[in-house]
């Protein structure tokens, strides 16, 4: 009875007032939850209370750090990680993220950017037993603090296990809490502050390049600074500053005179070392400390040595209109400044580039300056500019170019100017890159030049991408600008005012150039050393600033020695990467007008070998709108430019294989080199020179291709192929003779179709690549050629059903000529040879199974039809 009564009471209708009360409570709860997630920037920050105790402070008075129990650190084993930086950015276009990447790129450190995950997947951090990253950088440290529990534990375990550190930035905004604790850390943040007078903690263990002796007087940029405070001994100040106002910071337990703006976490709290910045990289000292932080947290694996080599070129000596040239006092100041700079840079010597034609073409006072300069000839280094300051790419005749150089050399000999420095610079860097062959030959003929420099390789901007290369025996070094140009001759008239020049020198672009490059060749001009002598002002103040704020050791070397040093540091840069000169307006302006990019091919047949590429080459050549390359005396119809030593002959050599285009827009050049397909170098090289090219590859059963290559080698009496059976070749083990392994590789490796196509897809869009079925090309060529024409977008479609005929004697399709005759490929094509033995076919079917499966996935991803042979192979493996 009582149970029944309770049940009835429970089932009674709920009063409306109670329902409304419950709804109101739920609404309030939802508002709080929405606010929590809407203002997610506050997550990870907890309001600071009064529980912070007053610690003892050393002089100078700074934010506190009290010794607490230490957690033992796992020794860092940097050999277990790859030298790669993982950078978590807010977006691909965020300013701070781009600045972080710019410093890494300038330092030539490898990196990978990822959008910082909130609840998304963390990138794969390990590969087997190796860590994939040596350092983690967060553009917004709150993205790290607020990681979901799974990813946070994953990342922290990785950092502890592999000794990987974290760099993070905290950028306050108008909604930031003025004082808060970083969630999960014994660290307090005080935000939206205006600061001044930044100093460096000399006891900071991460300092390497940074010299801690000075105070950067004045206001720090912005009013949104964050300072750090902690009682834990794991936190060590790196940079400190004062507040602009005399008022104390609310909630700060100690009235500290200096506040920490960059803090180093020694890893005593949780075993992970970190460096946290209380602002972005707009402040120049942050850039310097960031470089040191990268070095420290990677055990100096990602670090440049302290040595910096500097060479200052002065172009246009004797060139310049009246009023812009050096007078006697200017020449004396040049020499005196050189001697002054030698106290900081041993044997520092200005490098003077002269054009003899303009000697004594100034005012009387300037002509006296010319004479005094020549009286100091042994005090400076010298290099030839052009006699008449003409741009070399305008000279199409090498002998005329050589005559100009000979005049400059004659002038040098007459005035005692050294002629054996081995270095030259072309006016406006013309002819250096893009390469003007006549310039390189004339330089070697007249001057014996071994080194030059340019600001144009691979492009002028961004400057951090400039590189060196070697061509035709001449080493080409990257050249840097320094904020001075021919028209910047007066301090007060500097663009943007004198403050802009000082900003470039003192922590700005010029300072960063030296900081991030082990070797810097600076371009200046004669006019920068007359009048207000901005050249002298700039480099005196630059050296002073570097010596004040850094531990860098400034050195210099003559150009040839400097070039050898450069390629000793960067040997991978010796090989050039030729680019399309018409893709960069500056390049086109200093490229011979007799040359045209229309001479480049628009289609490449890349192979692989023994799949029908020569047949396709013949069929394409039948089309009236398509023109193939001229044959090579060494490699017949193939140029083989992008995959081997021919590449170093330059693009002029490459273009000579193609006709000079007519005025019609229908000219369509193509080339076929079947060994491009599996070349590791070719895809990148092709993409650089021919970024819009169409790519065709032909695939047959890789087992048949391997067997065909073996038979091809036997037909050419290859001793290894004659000695070993096909079965012995493809099954040879690691201990087999080297020449046998080489033949095995040429048989098997090109058949890794998916691997090679993916390499091409790293540089070309899928719609630029056409994969043809080699079996159909052999049996139904007319239909295949319809597909090819659509892919190429030719306007005058050709009906190959009417122009191809099957030749029963040859066993394949040939060109149909007038009178019913046919034109077929040579005797070397379509050879008959014994069928492959069953054991070899079985071995190869198993060998290529996974490769073929990956190929099917890749072709599906590319939107391409699976070849008939591939469908058959996949069905047989089920």
UniProtKB/Swiss-Prot annotation:
This is Bifunctional heparan sulfate N-deacetylase/N-sulfotransferase 1. Its main location: Golgi. Monomer. It is found in: Golgi apparatus membrane; Golgi apparatus, trans-Golgi network membrane. The chain crosses the membrane at residues 18-38. Its EC number is 3.5.1.-, 2.8.2.8. It comes from Xenopus tropicalis (Western clawed frog). Adenosine 3',5'-bisphosphate binds at residues 610-614, 708, 813, 829-833. Residues 1-17 are cytoplasmic. Keywords: Disulfide bond, Glycoprotein, Golgi apparatus, Hydrolase, Membrane, Multifunctional enzyme, Signal-anchor, Transferase, Transmembrane, Transmembrane helix. Residues 40-594 are annotated as: Heparan sulfate N-deacetylase 1. Residues 1-169 are annotated as: Sufficient for localization to Golgi membrane. The active site is at 610 (for sulfotransferase activity). Gene3D superfamilies: P-loop containing nucleotide triphosphate hydrolases. Pathway: Glycan metabolism; heparan sulfate biosynthesis; Glycan metabolism; heparin biosynthesis. Essential bifunctional enzyme that catalyzes both the N-deacetylation and the N-sulfation of glucosamine (GlcNAc) of the glycosaminoglycan in heparan sulfate. Modifies the GlcNAc-GlcA disaccharide repeating sugar backbone to make N-sulfated heparosan, a prerequisite substrate for later modifications in heparin biosynthesis. Plays a role in determining the extent and pattern of sulfation of heparan sulfate. One of its GO terms (biological process) is heparin proteoglycan biosynthetic process. One of its GO terms (cellular component) is Golgi membrane. Residues 39-878 are lumenal. It catalyses: alpha-D-glucosaminyl-[heparan sulfate](n) + 3'-phosphoadenylyl sulfate = N-sulfo-alpha-D-glucosaminyl-[heparan sulfate](n) + adenosine 3',5'-bisphosphate + 2 H(+). The keyword Protein transport does not apply.
């Amino acid at each position: 009875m009582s149970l029944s009564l309770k049940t009835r009471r429970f089932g009674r209708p709920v009063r409306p007032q109670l329902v409304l009360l419950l709804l109101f409570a739920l609404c309030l709860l939802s508002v709080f939850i929405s606010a929590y997630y809407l203002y997610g920037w506050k997550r990870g920050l907890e309001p600071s209370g009064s529980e912070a105790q007053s610690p003892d402070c050393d002089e100078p008075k700074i934010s506190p750090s009290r010794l607490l129990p230490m957690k033992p650190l796992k020794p860092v084993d940097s050999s277990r990680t790859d030298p790669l930086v993982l950078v978590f950015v807010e977006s691909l276009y965020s300013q701070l993220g781009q600045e972080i990447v710019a410093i890494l790129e300038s330092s030539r450190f490898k990196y990978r950017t990822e959008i910082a995950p909130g609840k998304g997947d963390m990138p794969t951090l390990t590969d087997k037993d190796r860590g994939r990253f040596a350092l983690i950088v967060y553009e917004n440290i709150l993205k790290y603090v607020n990681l979901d529990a799974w990813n946070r534990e994953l990342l922290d375990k990785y950092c502890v296990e592999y000794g990987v550190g974290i760099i993070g930035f905290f950028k306050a905004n108008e909604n930031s809490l003025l004082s808060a604790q970083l969630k999960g850390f014994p660290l307090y943040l005080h935000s939206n502050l205006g600061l001044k007078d930044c100093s460096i903690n000399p006891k900071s263990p991460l300092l390497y390049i940074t010299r801690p002796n000075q105070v950067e007087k004045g206001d720090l940029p912005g009013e949104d600074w964050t300072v750090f405070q902690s009682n834990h001994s794991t936190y060590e100040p790196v940079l400190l500053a004062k507040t602009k106002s005399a008022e104390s910071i609310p909630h700060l337990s100690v009235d500290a005179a200096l506040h920490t703006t960059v803090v180093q976490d020694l890893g005593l709290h949780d075993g992970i070392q970190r460096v946290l910045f209380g602002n972005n990289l707009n402040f120049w000292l942050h850039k310097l400390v960031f470089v040191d932080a990268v070095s420290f947290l990677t055990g100096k694996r990602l670090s440049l040595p302290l040595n910096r080599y500097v060479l200052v070129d002065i172009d246009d000596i004797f060139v310049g209109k009246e009023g812009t040239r050096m007078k006697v006092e200017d020449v004396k100041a040049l020499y005196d400044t050189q001697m002054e700079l030698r106290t900081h840079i041993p044997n520092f010597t200005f490098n003077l580039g002269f054009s003899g034609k303009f000697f004594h073409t100034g005012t009387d006072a300037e002509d006296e300056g010319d004479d005094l300069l020549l009286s100091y000839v042994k005090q400076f280094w010298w290099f030839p500019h052009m006699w008449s300051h003409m741009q070399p790419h305008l000279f199409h005749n090498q002998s005329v170019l050589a005559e100009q150089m000979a005049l400059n050399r004659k002038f040098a000999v007459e005035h005692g100017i050294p002629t054996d420095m081995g270095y030259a610079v072309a006016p406006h860097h013309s002819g250096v890159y893009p390469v003007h062959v006549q310039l390189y030959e004339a330089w070697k003929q007249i001057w014996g030049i071994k080194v030059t420099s340019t600001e144009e390789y691979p492009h002028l901007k961004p400057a951090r991408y400039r590189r060196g290369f070697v061509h035709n025996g001449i080493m080409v070094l990257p050249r840097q600008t320094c904020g001075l140009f021919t028209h910047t001759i007066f301090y007060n008239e500097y663009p943007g005012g004198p403050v802009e020049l000082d900003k470039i020198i003192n922590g700005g672009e010029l300072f960063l150039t030296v900081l991030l490059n082990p070797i810097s060749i600076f371009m200046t001009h004669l006019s920068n050393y007359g009048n207000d002598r901005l050249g002298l002002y700039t480099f005196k103040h630059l050296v002073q600033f570097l010596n004040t704020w850094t531990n860098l050791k400034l050195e210099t070397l003559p150009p040839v020695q400097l070039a050898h040093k450069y390629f000793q540091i960067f040997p991978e840069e010796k090989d050039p990467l030729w680019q399309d000169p018409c893709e960069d307006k500056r390049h086109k302006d200093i490229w011979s007008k007799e040359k045209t990019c229309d001479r480049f091919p628009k289609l490449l047949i890349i192979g692989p070998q023994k799949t029908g590429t020569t047949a396709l080459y013949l069929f394409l050549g039948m089309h009236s709108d398509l023109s193939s390359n001229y044959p090579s005396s060494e490699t017949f119809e193939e140029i083989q430019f992008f995959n081997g030593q021919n590449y170093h002959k330059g693009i002029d050599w490459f273009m000579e294989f193609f006709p000079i285009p007519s005025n019609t827009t229908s000219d369509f050049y193509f080339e076929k080199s079947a060994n491009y397909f599996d070349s590791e170098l070719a895809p990148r090289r092709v993409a650089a020179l021919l970024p819009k090219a169409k790519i065709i590859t032909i695939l047959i059963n890789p087992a048949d291709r391997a067997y065909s290559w073996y038979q091809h080698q036997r037909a050419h009496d290859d001793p290894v192929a004659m000695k070993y059976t096909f079965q012995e070749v493809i099954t040879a083990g690691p201990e087999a003779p080297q020449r046998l392994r080489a033949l095995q590789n040429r048989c098997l490796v090109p058949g890794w179709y998916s691997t090679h196509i993916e390499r091409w897809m790293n540089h070309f869009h899928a719609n630029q690549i056409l994969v043809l079925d080699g079996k159909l090309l052999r049996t139904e060529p007319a239909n295949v050629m319809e597909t090819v024409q659509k892919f190429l977008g030719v306007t005058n479609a050709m009906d190959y059903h009417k122009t191809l005929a099957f030749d029963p004697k040859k066993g394949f399709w040939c060109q149909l000529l007038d009178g019913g005759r046919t034109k077929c490929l040579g005797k070397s094509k379509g050879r008959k040879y014994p069928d492959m033995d069953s054991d070899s076919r079985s071995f190869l079917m198993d060998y290529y199974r996974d490769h073929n499966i990956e190929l099917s996935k890749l072709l599906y991803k590319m939107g391409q039809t699976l070849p008939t042979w591939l469908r058959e192979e996949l069905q047989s493996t089920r």
